[in-house]
Regions:
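DUTPase catalytic domain/fold
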Residues: 1-142
Length: 142
């Protein structure tokens, strides 16, 4: 799918690192240090025009999470089709050491997803005739 993009950074456009990658890696357009338990809004220099009926989700990179405890705070972040501002990524440091972000570092990935708008059917109660019913939060076991 064709998505219009403006790149005001010196970085490459978001890239799919393998043929099977669902997400395209996006890079930092600034330097920052994220302290342990701290978070920062990292600018990318990217502006997109997403077709109506779609969104872009901003998701963590698994390597940053596993190796450094760095993840996207509001994961997945949503970029709506009518947003035209710069893409920013809120990163949080769950690690024990300060984490340096440099210009050009791959900080997150973006995934284009179809959006279905909900048409509500308001009822007084829901059909509770399922085996699970209202059980949740670990009720199916470890």
């Amino acid at each position: 799918m064709l998505v219009k993009i403006v790149n005001k950074s010196s970085n490459a456009l978001p890239q799919f690192e393998t043929g099977g990658s669902a997400g395209a890696d996006i890079r930092s357009n600034q330097q920052a240090i994220i302290q342990p338990v701290g978070y920062e809004l990292i600018k990318t220099g990217l502006f997109v025009e997403i077709p109506y009926g779609y969104e872009i989700q901003i998701r963590p990179r698994s390597g940053l999470a596993f190796k450094n405890g760095i993840t996207v705070l509001n994961s997945p972040g949503t970029i709506d089709s009518d947003y035209r501002g710069e893409i920013g990524v809120i990163l949080i440091n769950h690690g024990t050491e300060p984490f340096d972000i440099n210009v050009g570092d791959r900080i997150a990935q973006m995934v284009l997803s179809k959006v279905e708008h909900i048409q509500w059917h308001a009822l007084g109660s829901l059909d509770s005739g399922t085996k699970r019913g209202e059980k949740g939060f670990g009720s199916t076991g470890k």
